[in-house]
Amino acid sequence: MPDPLSPAQRHTCMSHIRSTGTKPEMQLRKELFRLGYRYRINKKRLPGSPDIVLAKYSTCIFVNGCFWHGHMDCRYATRPKTNAQFWRTKIENNRERDLKDYTFLESLGWRVIVVWECELKKDRIDATIASVRKQLDANRESCLAELADRRKRREEWQAEIRRRKERSEEIQVNVKIH
């Protein structure tokens, strides 16, 4: 079925679709801020430019639109009947790109939380916020444990360097005596 809009009309329609500052994203950001979480938004230096970045928790949050990111079995993710092949390819490419970005972020040590647009509807938002909060708190505990482990390894490494330095000085003293 051909597109009922002219290319100029379609361009105008598509240019009004926002990629940042969407209503679902703003809802989640507002709730996180209210709960005391502080974050950065749309961090361009990270793969996929996450919508919300909580560095303290080593966590990136993506707020995905059900349609654009192909949320499976979601009533908001129905594909248009016109230009069906284009939309199938577009959404599949989006899903593949998202998976690649999430995997890369995780390989860099980030934890990834994906929140779907439908999870931020009135009847589900409280449960979604509670779930995100639970994940963030778990991530914080994990981050604190990692920091403690790093601190311990750094102290052990510094102690080893001190021992080597002392041995080196002892050897130099012994060489001077003989």
Predicted regions and their residues:
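Nucleic-acid endo/exonuclease domains
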Residues: M1-V114, C118-H178
